[in-house]
């Protein structure tokens, strides 16, 4: 995945005078699975529409295989889109839905038969080719939509929240299948999602967006473990964010009257324009007087695979902790963490 198949350079978009994309720039590598992740209204779907050709940017460049993509009409772009609604034809059976694009192109019948059945087998629907769409489950409909897109042999597949309509269990299954399929066929996938867990589990890289801007680009591990600002840290899972700490010097921070080790460097000396993040799963609950701070349990919530425990220290700071152990309200404990689990970042600057 060395070559950039797609490049966006300072792309902007306005609707009725409202700026919805504010200078978006990122590259997509050939064969990469990249997710545009963010809350509703952040601009991620607008980017997908601009890449697909149904909308044009107000300014900026988009290069596909080093050529200007913007003037190329939709039907000439080597992309296919899978919509949240799947946009299947209810009056056609599975085979004819998958074959639709090839039929419109007047492809020879023997080629249609071969290519359609190959894709139907690829998505695990062999034996369903004569079924009507309304006879299929949600997951099967999604497989038809995927086969219909892939039969056209696009170089890039665009996915607009493709699993949003599925129930939780089926969504997990389809996430695994879609990732496996992408790895098997090796083409570039660009997916829009508001689901953090989905993006973390499926993507090679994630573009995190908010209010028309890119907050961070990175691998799932980078996004989760090294968020670039407090907004990303809060959006990607729960976080304990210390906003009043001080970066004393390389590998040393201070808050609530105590000095702690960290692995961060290059934030200067006695620097207060920083935030400190410690993830809930990285905090260890110990017996009183065995940790950095003594604390009292003030809330517990069972989350299925772990307990979410909220404790409060004598400094009145509250900490969210994820643990497999159950604790009682008002129980006295102490908390501790490892230096590698402390993450320092610059405070966000309001422009």
From Swiss-Prot:
Keywords: ATP-binding, Cell membrane, Membrane, Nucleotide-binding, Translocase, Transport. ATP binds at residues 38-45. Its EC number is 7.6.2.11. Residues 6-236 form the ABC transporter domain. PROSITE patterns: ABC_TRANSPORTER_1, ABC_TRANSPORTER_2, POTA. It catalyses: ATP + H2O + polyamine-[polyamine-binding protein]Side 1 = ADP + phosphate + polyamineSide 2 + [polyamine-binding protein]Side 1. Pfam families: ABC_tran, TOBE_2. It is found in: Cell membrane. It is a peripheral membrane protein. Its main location: membrane. It comes from the Bacteria. One of its GO terms (molecular function) is ABC-type putrescine transporter activity. Part of the ABC transporter complex PotABCD involved in spermidine/putrescine import. Responsible for energy coupling to the transport system. Belongs to the ABC transporter superfamily. Spermidine/putrescine importer (TC 3.A.1.11.1) family. NCBIfam families: MMSYN1_0197. The complex is composed of two ATP-binding proteins (PotA), two transmembrane proteins (PotB and PotC) and a solute-binding protein (PotD). This is Spermidine/putrescine import ATP-binding protein PotA. The gene is potA.
